[in-house]
Regions:
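Conserved beta-strand and immediately adjacent loop positions that scaffold enzyme active sites
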Residues: 9, 37, 361
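Early-domain small/polar-rich strand-loop-helix modules and first-structured segments
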Residues: 14-88
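C-terminal, non-catalytic interaction/recognition modules in large multi-subunit enzymes and RNPs
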Residues: 5, 44, 53-54, 59, ...
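Short glycine-aspartate micro-motif
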Residues: 1-2, 38-40, 184
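Gly/Thr-rich phosphate-binding beta-strand-loop-beta motif of the actin/hexokinase/Hsp70
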Residues: 1-14, 47-50, 172
Length: 383
């Protein structure tokens, strides 16, 4: 769950593997290339709240951006945003410094929500902020359901990994909305995507479309095609150490418009490919059709090299709160401890409600959540 300033991206990791797809849509255009399966919505910390003609509160996709940014930045922004709502609810503080030199101002944030009130039946900017926060959380919940429930997975069986500059501020509230009982917030979560880019192993894919019925395919001809693909990716990858290669195929039942990518092993066996596809289809869609014929749409070779990730070991020296402030939980404002996350040593226990502030993000831990900081600085909380 990656929430930034203008958008939120959600993906699924199942059995240690990130879900991938060969079908996506960008700007209304279908894209058919291998990619990580990500559901994106236009809701982030800078997303602007408004009231539509029917009186319903909407959040995004319009964004205040970085300039002028949310009203609380004090840079001339006048529209109410999700970040402004978080400030009025106490999740961010006026003593919170974002980046190196940006101090938040509650006055402009309050004024922005006051301008929203005439279009609602509310008379309190804090009540409007609560509504905006709830609407934003529900939009994110719908995105999570699209990558879980819609694909036949129960989100209650997963942990929510929250990152991005704004993600950890909504993580436990989002988890409660989905009845998820475990949340993990990695260290350096505000720049985790950039860190992942640097640490990710080199990967190269090659594919060939064949579109043939599985029960009539020539296994030897398929093997020859796989060998040519292997030669191609090996030439492009060079000779890095620790290279692993897998053979895959995009398969579907006859008449379907979507495929599933299945690892089929070597040498190519139609019977093994069929059984793995039936099992994959049942996991992904909830059913199998053993009497239906299967089509081989594309064969693929996936080559991954090793990568030396950065050292992200963690040391801290202070486990006590640095202060307290009033924050909104359970229908009321409550005195809430505030911690400096980068100073928390591994093994520190955290009981909600609590707020953990760091250089690039803020973590909000709701009531009934508790957990600890592990040796890498990851915060793991559950309820």
């Amino acid at each position: 769950f990656d929430m930034g300033g203008t958008s939120t991206d959600v993906g699924l990791v199942r059995d240690g593997e990130i879900e991938r797809t060969t079908e996506a849509e960008i700007g209304g255009h279908p894209i058919h290339v291998p990619m990580v399966a990500v559901e994106t919505i236009g809701a982030g910390g800078g997303s602007i709240a408004r009231v539509d003609e029917g009186g319903a509160v909407r959040v995004g996709p319009q964004s205040a951006g970085a300039e002028p940014g949310p009203a609380c930045y004090g840079r001339g922004g006048t529209d109410p945003t999700v970040t402004d709502a978080s400030l009025l609810l106490g999740y961010l503080g006026t003593d919170t410094t974002l980046g190196e030199d940006l101090d938040l101002e509650v006055g402009p944030a309050k004024a922005a929500f006051e301008r929203l009130l005439p279009d609602t039946d509310l008379d309190d900017p804090v009540a409007a902020a609560r509504g905006v926060y709830r609407v934003a959380t529900e939009r994110m919940a719908r995105a999570v359901r699209k990558v879980t429930v819609r694909e036949g997975h129960d989100p209650r069986g997963f942990a929510l990994v929250a990152f991005g500059g704004a993600g950890p501020m909504h993580a436990t509230a989002l988890a409660e909305r989905l009845d998820i009982r475990s949340v993990r917030v990695p260290r350096a979560n505000g720049v985790l995507s950039a860190l992942g880019l640097l640490a990710a192993p080199l990967r190269n894919d090659a594919s060939r479309t064949i579109r043939e019925p599985l029960d009539g395919i020539d296994p030897e001809a398929v093997e020859e095609r796989y060998e040519r693909l292997l030669e191609q990716v090996r030439g492009e990858m060079g000779s890095p150490g620790g290279v692993t290669t897998t053979r895959q195929a995009d398969l579907r039942y006859a008449g379907q418009s979507h495929e599933l990518t299945v690892e089929i092993g070597a040498p190519f066996s139609p019977a093994r490919a069929a059984e793995r596809f039936h099992a994959a289809h049942e996991r992904a869609r909830g059913y199998r059709l053993p009497e239906e014929s299967i089509e081989v749409v594309t064969i693929r070779v996936d080559t991954t090299g090793s990568a030396d990730g950065p050292d992200i070991s963690h040391e801290g020296e202070r486990s006590e709160p640095t202060g307290y402030r009033e924050a909104f939980f359970g229908g009321e404002f409550r005195e809430t401890p505030v911690y400096r996350r980068d100073r928390l040593p591994s093994g520190t226990d955290i009981d909600g409600p609590a707020i953990l502030e760091g250089g690039e993000s803020t973590v909000v831990v709701g009531p009934d959540w508790s957990g600890t900081v592990d040796e890498r600085g990851t915060l793991e909380v559950s309820r």
